[in-house]
Amino acid sequence: MRIILHLDMDAFFASIEERDRDYLKGKAIVVGADPKEGKGRGVVSTANYQARRYGISSGMPISEAWKIAKEVEKSKKEKIYFVAPDFGKYQKVSQNIFEILKKYSPKIEKASIDEFYLDLSFLKSFFKAKKVAQEIKREIFEKEKLTASIGIGPNKFVAKIASQMKKPNGEMAILPAKVKDFLAPLLIREIPGVGSKTEEKLNQMGIKTIGDLRKLSLSKLKSLFGKRGEDFYQKARGIDQSEIVVREEIKSLGKQITLEKDTLSTKVLLEKFTKILKEVFEEFKRSEFKTFREITLILRFSDFETKTVSKTFKKPLSSMKDFEVQSLKLLLPFLDQRKNPKKKKIRLLGLRIKNFDEK
């Protein structure tokens, strides 16, 4: 019998900022790009639950979040605080949580910076697994002053849905015999891979819930969606064979930024590019890697045309100087006639490194 635990930290970035800044205690918080008085061009990384009440959510344009904040401030007399992200700090807290979890299972998958799967099958009891979940939540709060939501199920799919149902700061265990009843009333969009177009197509057929989806045969789903149809058929029945990935290999490190204003100013672009260089290299130095052999430049023009240029090196790189020199060789042709003959302004800059050797 498989017993899988899914742990999702609650409003992770915003909760860390609230913990670390006294003036944010109990306030509505948005972590993301600088809103620039409503003219910012980035997005919301995380909004805490107080901010979500007003419709602010992750991925929303920061300018839209700012407009909502101003309306709330005017009508509700409540201030929404905007905070710049500190990803280095968040990564450190994530690692602290990972160290806590290692005491509870030898098989852990770090699905993202704030999301983990643990294999608790060795306990052979959902009752014991729920006790472990409560102990994990207690220890995380004791050591990090942060809350988490936990779902437990016979597979990753069910466990993750269960954790989302009990946010924030809750836990839920779904026994194998209860899986179909648990899933039946949920909307089909809860199934991974069911996006808005797929949902619309199924809704037109009268299929709105996972229970409805079970009425369709495997052959019908495959005829409608090809190979994905087989996965939908399995998920609708609560079947998920995906394994816990103990160590997801880091394939690349990088950063990209959307500029405040489209530009072809060499001064502005080099200033921003240097900042990206430093941040990527600092992340590399904090990693378990010793060298890298490939650099990729990502560049987007004002007309949204995107260019990606990579260079692989026979001799591995490890110094900031080499990284800077080689990266500039990729960028500079786009600042003049060589690779930008139409003199198009640049909207986005990014760098990635890969092909690592470990320390």
Regions from the PLM with identified roles:
Residues 111-115, 153-156, 290-294, 344-348:
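Short Gly/Ser/Thr- and Asp/Glu-enriched loop/turn motifs at secondary-structure junctions
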Residues 6, 190, 198, 203-346, ...:
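DNA-contacting surface of Y-family translesion DNA polymerases
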Residues 1-113, 117, 236:
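Residues that scaffold, gate, or flank divalent-cation-dependent active/transport sites
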Residues 118-137, 206:
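Catalytic palm subdomain of template-directed nucleic-acid polymerases
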Residues 128-187:
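Long, highly charged, low-complexity intrinsically disordered interaction regions
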Residues 16-18, 42-45, 158-166, 244-247:
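Short acidic, glycine/serine/threonine-rich loops at helix termini
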